[in-house]
Amino acid sequence: MPEDRAKAYTEAGVDINAGNALVSRIKSMVASTHTKGVISDIGGFGGLFKPDLGGMEDPVLVSSTDGVGTKLKLAFMFDKHDTVGIDLVAMSVNDVLVQGAKPLFFLDYFATGKLDVEAAAQVVSGVAEGCRQAQCALLGGETAEMPDMYAPGEYDLAGFCVGIADNARIVDGSDIRVGDVIIGLGASGVHSNGYTLVRKLFEKSGLGADDIMPGTDASVRDVLMTPTRIYVETIRNLMRDFQIKGMVHVTGGGFYDNIPRVLPASVDARIAFGAWDILPVFHWLRDLGELSWPEMLQIFNCGIGYVVIVGQEEADDVLGRLAALDQPAWAIGTVERRREESEEQVYVDFG
């Protein structure tokens, strides 16, 4: 665009040419995510997607929106922007997956005060990587440059996912029964929740970004910025051969707030603490914050990022399949009859 046509807007703080430069940088990234349903290119007013409804008697669209939260503050602090895009995708696609939906497409929203093309391109590269992992298309997005709205060098992200499921195969927890087995799938790290506390504890620790995280051989930066695991391929594999009765994406509120969201009112979940491997980062956070394990399980995933609930007769086979898929997983609990005297539905045995 000729400079004189955008001069006044640039002087006001919005650089249209920078926005165009970003679009040029990310075109190939976006194209790398396209699936056969995409029938439009980047730059249109809306993204076009033609879903394949073959084999679905009663298709239902499933949608979700989410952000990355204050994990972004660490991205700014560490000047590391290439993984938060994966987090952004994971937070939405894992949510639609809980209902048994296959993610179809994703859209992102990037808002900042002054557009840093390099940082934004790194973010979008992560979004594209997340979409490839989730086997969904990055169909479009919005970049908003809003002077005076954000501190220099900072931005915010939001993501939107649409998936599809056959109505008869929607997973809603209604088939969960007493005796079913609760299987926890390992997390990659802290994922994207609890980072307001994580940041405070990191500052308290006195460690630098390049220092080694206690109990690991990785830097504090790499451990804290490890992206949220995307479970789409693994769960889609399980759903082909097993009856998955309920699923949980373990996000804000941990076990106590998320597992009850899929349980019928007639049952409780009993969790055996110690049945799974707790990652070193959670021991580090607990020690720094002088937190109890019940507090930790209310705030963080503590090493379990996703839960599936299956019948007892299928539990061993499901665990075997997960091992074959290189997905760490453990039988972490069972479904029991509801305790009528209590409002709680999750009980953790700390032994």
From Swiss-Prot:
Keyword entries, A-Z: ATP-binding, Cytoplasm, Ligase, Nucleotide-binding, Purine biosynthesis
Main localization of the protein described in the UniProt heading: cytoplasm
Biological process according to GO: 'de novo' IMP biosynthetic process; adenine biosynthetic process
A Pfam entry, by short name: AIRS_C
Record field: catalytic activity: 2-formamido-N(1)-(5-O-phospho-beta-D-ribosyl)acetamidine + ATP = 5-amino-1-(5-phospho-beta-D-ribosyl)imidazole + ADP + phosphate + H(+)
GO molecular-function term, one example from the UniProt record: ATP binding
InterPro entries: PurM-like_C_dom, PurM-like_C_sf, PurM-like_N, PurM-like_N_sf, PurM_cligase
Record keyword Repressor present: no
EC number: 6.3.3.1
Subcellular location: Cytoplasm
Keyword Acetylation: no
Pathway involvement of the protein, from the record: Purine metabolism; IMP biosynthesis via de novo pathway; 5-amino-1-(5-phospho-D-ribosyl)imidazole from N(2)-formyl-N(1)-(5-phospho-D-ribosyl)glycinamide: step 2/2
GO cellular component terms listed in the entry, alphabetical order: cytosol
Family, as annotated: Belongs to the AIR synthase family.
Name this polypeptide is given: Phosphoribosylformylglycinamidine cyclo-ligase
Species per Swiss-Prot/TrEMBL record: Oleidesulfovibrio alaskensis (strain ATCC BAA-1058 / DSM 17464 / G20) (Desulfovibrio alaskensis)
This protein's encoding gene: purM
